[in-house]
Amino acid sequence: MAPAIQRQWLVARRPVGRPIEPADFELKECPVEEPSPGEVLVRTVYLSFDPAQKSWMENAAGYMAPVEIGGVMPGSGAGVVVRSGHPDFGPGDAVYGRLGWRDYATVPADALDKAPEGVPLDAVLSVLGGTGRTAYLALMKVGQPVAGDTLVISGAAGATGSLVGQIGKIAGCRVIGIAGGPEKCAWLTQELGFDAAIDYRHEKVRARLRDLAPAGVDIFFDNVGGEILNDALARLAARAPVVICGAISRYNFDPRSPQMPEGPRNYFNVVFTGATIQGFLMPQHERDYPEADARLAQWVRAGRITPRADVQRGFENAPATLMRLFEGRNVGKQLLQVEAD
């Protein structure tokens, strides 16, 4: 049974040109909406967090519908169907999709997917959905790895980067991850099977790339931007694809401000190497979602991909959980378990 009242987090301010703050959100209660025909009422078990959510709040993401002040904070989640107005879903079904920051969410059925059997809900959000689809499609369709390629990933200990590295290993690549701190680097090499890791906080990235990839970087998968991107551009192999998936080093700056970090200085090496730079947006690859979902679920069941979630607890902690991403505190996929216990 669903309660009569649901909790939801609303967007109260736009964090343009600065870090996210708790006052950017407002916690409110409202009546639970009964599902109309074509809708489903879901009890949220986990919420998923991604750096792109900051750009959604700023209305800087042109591929997303505008987020209004006073509107529910958008985001993905996983949960259990309570009541359904659609024949494809029934009470008790485990689902994931665009739930928003709500402990009970009434959403259109086409905003949901059923969780694969044998995959726990936290692993579903860690490996499937937007995170997994981004990792798989950006690497396989844009990066197009070939066995023997040297694949370098920035933000490698994050949700997307850690998956990209594991998929790269399955594809036969030599994988080098760039992450911040010895704990994250050890996790990449000792648990996920990366061939090497570079600690950008304590090592010079360009020098380490020269040592670890003397013939050059065959694929660079970028989640960070800034100086790390600049260093990678200097070490590209001939015709290397550079996949731009994120730029978390720049997200806290107003693009109109003089404080915005400079763009890469080594971009002209793209000319010398014949490399390509291509951005990735998941909605542009919608027709390939079934392929990504099937492959990822298969690899999880077979133990070829190791999910890891950084799980915080308590619905009231949603804003602080999002802020963890920008503080570099998460290892793996950042999730929030709605119930505290």
Predicted regions mapped to residue ranges:
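Short, glycine/polar-rich helix-capping loops at beta-to-alpha or helix-loop-helix junctions
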Residues: 102-103, 180-188, 262-267
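Glycine-rich phosphate-binding loop and adjacent beta-alpha segment
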Residues: 227-305, 338-341
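Short glycine-centered segments of the SAM/dcSAM-binding site in methyltransferase folds
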Residues: 94, 150, 174, 240-241, ...
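C-terminal capping/lid region of NAD(P)-dependent oxidoreductase domains
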Residues: 2-6, 304-311, 319-341
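Short amphipathic alpha-helix with an adjacent loop that forms part of the alpha/beta core around
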Residues: 205-214
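Mid-domain Rossmann-like dinucleotide-binding core that forms the NAD(H)/NADP(H) cofactor-binding site
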Residues: 126-203
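NAD(P)H dinucleotide-binding glycine-rich loop of Rossmann-like/cofactor-binding domains
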Residues: 73-80, 90-155, 304
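Glycine-rich beta-strand-centered segment in the early N-terminal region that forms part
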Residues: 31-49, 57-101
